[in-house]
Structures are given as C-alpha cells and as structure tokens.
C-alpha cells in the first residue's frame, strides 16, 4: 500500500513540476506526516527528493523549497541530507518538527502564500480544516492527502457533482445510488420511470497575472459564487477540500486485496489538467500491486480492478444514477461528473455513454453525429 501511494505521489510531483518549473517562480513542496505515518515519512520524503534529483537539469536556476514536517524520526536528517547534496543549489530542504498541524506556520515562513505550493499530508491531522486551508494558500495550490477510511468524518453515502452545484436553479433531488442499478456487465438497463430525478528560506513572488489558458484555474460563471458542499456530505474528505478553497477535488479508496485496512486518497487542485493527470496516474498503477479502487460514495462498496481500460459497467450505472437525479446533461457535464465524483477519468465517459446508448438505456440529442461535448444525454424511459 505505501509503495503504491509513494508511486502516485512521485508521479503527481512530476506532473506538477512540468507546469510550475517553466514559469520560473519560487515554489514550495510541503510534506507533513502525523502519528501513524512516521514510518512512511522517510521513504516518502526520499521518493520526492529522488524525483527532484531526476529533474535536476530543469531545476537549475530555479528556487524550490522542500519542507518535511515530521516528529520522532531520527533517520530523516541523515538520509535526506545525502540526497539534498545531489540537488541543484536553488533547491533547499528544511526539516520541521511537528506534523500536519504545523503546516500553516511552515508554509507562511517559507513564503508560500501567492506562490506555487504542492502539499502532501499523511497521518493524524491531515484533514484538519486549518491545515487544508494552508495548502490552498498557494497560487496555485495543490494538495494530495492520504488518510484512514475509518477516521471520524470520512464515511460517505452520496456526493453531488461539482457541475450539478454550478447549474443555476439546479433542483435538490434525492440521489439514485449507483448500487441501485443492476450489477450485470451486460447491456445497461434504464432506471424505472418512477426514478426521482517552519525554518525555511523566506521570500515569495506575487502572483503572475496573465490571460486564461487551458491550465487556468477552474471557476464558476462570472458573477457567481463557488458553492460550498451541502450538509449531507459535510463529512467527506472531498467536501472538506472544496470548503478549504480548492475548486476541484476528488477522492478514491485504496483497498488491499489481502484484507488489510483501506486508505483514502484525495486531491485538491484548481486546474483541470492536474486533476486529469491524477486520474491518469491512478489507472496506470501496476495491476499486480495488490489493491483495488473503491468509490467512497458507493453504498454497495463495489471494488474496481485497475486496468488501462477499466470495465465501463460501474461508470454506466453511476452516469445513469446522475441523469436520474439531475435530468438531462451534456456530455461535457457528465465528463466533469466522472472526473470529480467517481474514480474514473473523463476519457472513460465516451465508452460508457456508447454502451448506454447502444443498449437503449439512454438517448441523445441530436440523435446522430459525433458525440461532442454539447450533445445532451437523457435517461430512456420505459413505456
């Protein structure tokens, strides 16, 4: 399990560096380990510094501060010191006593407010609101966290899509859970007609204004306010990230096949590209890693096998449930729903929609032509 999480962290860091380094702004990477994660602290911090060493050529002439917050681990100074010696002069590594609770003070001392900030949180205190808010203080801010699924406040029964809360006048309708749909891998049936819809180098750089790009932060429509999560999902890690200031968030449970405790992995970001990269990383994890994925919002707790082309049946059921709950949606809206509210990628939606349309479980408008983003998908009603 720890090896899988380290691999995901390292690859997410690589994706983050690709976006941040080219901008030439001072940046901060903060790693915070609480009680229960101290054994993983050394290996995770080493993995991060190893990634930075691999990108040493791109980091030369750049200013990057790495904060490692952990208590009670005597191996850290020696093992990280050896790796720090291989990094470019502009990369500084600082060990800070304490766990996630010290993150707000540490990132402030490092001048991370208003500069690119990537945070990784593991262990006790990782979901504290003040800690998550500190991770959102970067411009941009991105946060990856892992926590036990049995901690108070991380049990979910349903979670609305971000797109749904963005729609003006969207009705608050009961959710039709994915588990209510047939579990068969055959043709997807339509739902019934009755379905209800610390010490670090100071210094920072001000945010750099510029025209919007495809990597621009997600936002609501002009003049609108980013909605907070509804009360019924107030215990969700994903909802906590949204409340902390991350416009985009997603979560997935990592379930070991050996029966050991599952862990919840969540990402908060402001960039579509980062969220897409995270999902791509998830589905390219080694299929023999000994874990399965689970949607925290699925009451039936179905397990998803890792594959380059995941089986579309569970996503079909989830999309049908979303359509039954909210009414007709465009392909673009369904792609966003899959990206934020399920473990799936947005590219998986086309395959699922094709199966839904072919089986007669859903209809499209217009009826013919390319399945573009503006095509409207509707649940097919039985006579």
Language model regions located:
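C-terminal target-recognition/interaction regions appended to catalytic cores
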Residues: 281-383
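SAM cofactor-binding core of SAM-dependent methyltransferases
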Residues: 2-109, 345-355
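A conserved mid-domain beta-alpha-beta active-site/ligand-binding segment of alpha/beta enzyme cores
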Residues: 156, 218-269, 310
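Conserved proline-anchored active-site loop of SAM-dependent methyltransferases
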Residues: 27-42, 112-130, 146-148, 268
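Short, conserved loop/helix-junction motifs that constitute active-site signature segments
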Residues: 58-59, 134-140
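Core SAM-dependent methyltransferase catalytic element
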Residues: 264-277, 284
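Conserved beta-strand signature within the Rossmann-like core of class I S-adenosyl-L-methionine
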Residues: 139-153
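Long, intrinsically disordered low-complexity tandem-repeat segments
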Residues: 155-220, 224
């Amino acid at each position: 399990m720890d090896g899988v999480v380290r691999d995901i962290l390292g690859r997410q860091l690589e994706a983050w560096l690709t976006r941040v380094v080219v901008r030439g702004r001072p940046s901060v990477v903060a790693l915070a380990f609480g009680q229960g994660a101290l054994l993983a602290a050394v290996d995770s911090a080493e993995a991060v510094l190893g990634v930075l060493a691999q990108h040493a050529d791109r980091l030369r002439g750049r200013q990057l501060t790495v904060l490692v917050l952990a208590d009670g681990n005597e191996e850290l100074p020696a093992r990280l010191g050896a790796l720090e010696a291989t990094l470019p002069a502009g990369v500084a590594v600082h060990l800070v006593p304490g766990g996630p609770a010290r993150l707000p003070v540490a990132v402030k001392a490092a001048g991370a407010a208003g500069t690119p900030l990537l945070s990784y949180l593991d262990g006790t205190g990782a979901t504290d609101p003040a800690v998550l808010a500190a991770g959102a203080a970067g411009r941009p801010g991105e946060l990856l966290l892992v926590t036990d699924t049995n901690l108070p406040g991380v049990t979910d029964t349903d979670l609305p899509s971000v797109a749904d809360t963005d729609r003006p006048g969207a009705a608050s309708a009961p959710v039709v859970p994915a588990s209510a749909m047939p579990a068969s891998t055959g043709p997807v049936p339509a739902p019934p007609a009755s379905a209800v819809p610390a010490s670090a180098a100071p210094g920072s750089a001000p945010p750099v204004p510029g025209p919007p790009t495809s990597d621009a932060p997600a936002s609501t429509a002009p003049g609108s306010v980013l909605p907070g999560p509804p009360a019924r999902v107030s215990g969700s890690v994903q909802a906590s990230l949204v409340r902390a200031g991350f416009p985009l968030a997603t979560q997935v449970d990592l379930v070991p096949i050996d029966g050991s405790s599952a862990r919840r992995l969540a990402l908060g970001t402001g960039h579509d590209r980062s969220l897409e990269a995270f999902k791509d990383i998830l589905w390219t994890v080694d299929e023999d890693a000994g874990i399965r994925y689970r949607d925290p919002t699925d009451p039936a707790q179905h397990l998803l096998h890792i594959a380059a082309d995941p089986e579309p049946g569970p996503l079909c059921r989830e999309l049908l449930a979303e359509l039954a709950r909210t009414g007709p949606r465009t392909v673009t809206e369904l792609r966003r729903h899959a990206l934020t509210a399920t473990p799936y990628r947005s590219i998986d939606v086309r395959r699922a929609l094709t199966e839904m349309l072919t089986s007669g479980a859903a209809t499209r408008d217009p009826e013919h032509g390319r399945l573009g983003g503006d095509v409207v998908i509707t649940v097919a009603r039985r006579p």
